A protein has these predicted regions:
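Residues that define the transmembrane beta-barrel architecture of outer-membrane proteins
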Residues: 1, 25-29, 74-80, 114-122, ...
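Short glycine/proline- and aromatic-enriched beta-strand/turn motifs that initiate or cap beta-hairpins
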Residues: 1-22
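Residues on the lipid-exposed face of transmembrane beta-strands in outer-membrane beta-barrel proteins
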Residues: 3-9, 31-35, 80-86, 95-97, ...
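Short loop/turn motifs that connect adjacent beta-strands in outer-membrane beta-barrel proteins
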Residues: 11, 38-45, 85-93, 126-136, ...
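Mid-chain, structured segments of secreted extracytoplasmic proteins
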Residues: 20-49
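Outer-membrane beta-barrel translocator/channel fold
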Residues: 46-81, 86, 96-108, 137-152, ...
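A contiguous pocket-lining binding segment that forms or flanks enzyme active sites
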Residues: 107-133
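Predominantly the C-terminal beta-signal and adjacent terminal strand-loop region
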Residues: 141, 150-177
């Protein structure tokens, strides 16, 4: 079950997204604030991503409730993102880069210190149409080693091709599939 609630005024938007399993206790709550700079400008976003069950501290004490924000113990991952669509009508490629800058995204460095990992994810999207079917090709990647995404270096982690087509029943009603 994944409800979404969004609100926008001008170029500013707030979005709340959640996910829960109907058969298990897995939960996620994401809150995002975003601002688009002009009609064709980049979009800057800041988000908190919270996963239930992600913050067991070293002494075994479970402290992961939604309102617990202590560094190194919180289940929140704070992330900044920058997205941009190339202003080329025949090549509308969008590029997005997201980096976790605070919260539970941690790693032990070479000196044995618990530090912020700065895990990042990059995604390219290219929309196009073929015979009335709208398509979107996606390539997502992790640019460097990070414990958050379980990779030891550069890795392509998401390849997708999405297809949608509206089936028109009459002039006022269509069903997107």
């Amino acid at each position: 079950f994944q409800p979404t609630l969004g609100f926008s005024v001008g170029n500013f938007s707030l979005t709340a997204w959640g996910s829960t399993s109907l058969s298990e206790s897995n939960k996620e709550i994401d809150l995002t604030a975003a601002y688009k700079f002009g009609e064709a400008g980049p979009t800057l976003s800041v988000a908190t991503l919270w996963w239930d069950g992600q913050a067991d501290v070293a002494n075994g004490e479970y402290t992961n409730n939604y309102f617990h924000f202590k560094s190194g113990e919180t289940g929140h991952h704070f992330e900044a993102g920058l997205a941009y669509t190339l202003p080329i009508e025949k090549f509308p490629l969008s590029i997005a880069w997201y980096t976790m800058f605070a919260g539970a995204d941690r790693k032990i460095n070479d000196k044995g210190e618990d530090k912020q990992a700065y895990s990042s994810y990059v995604e390219l999207n290219y929309p196009f149409s073929v015979k009335g079917v709208d398509l979107n090709a996606t390539c997502g990647m992790v640019p460097y080693e990070t414990p958050q995404y379980y990779v030891n270096g550069f890795a392509v982690t998401n390849l997708a091709l999405k297809a949608t087509k509206a089936i028109n029943f009459n002039d006022k009603f269509s069903l997107p599939i």
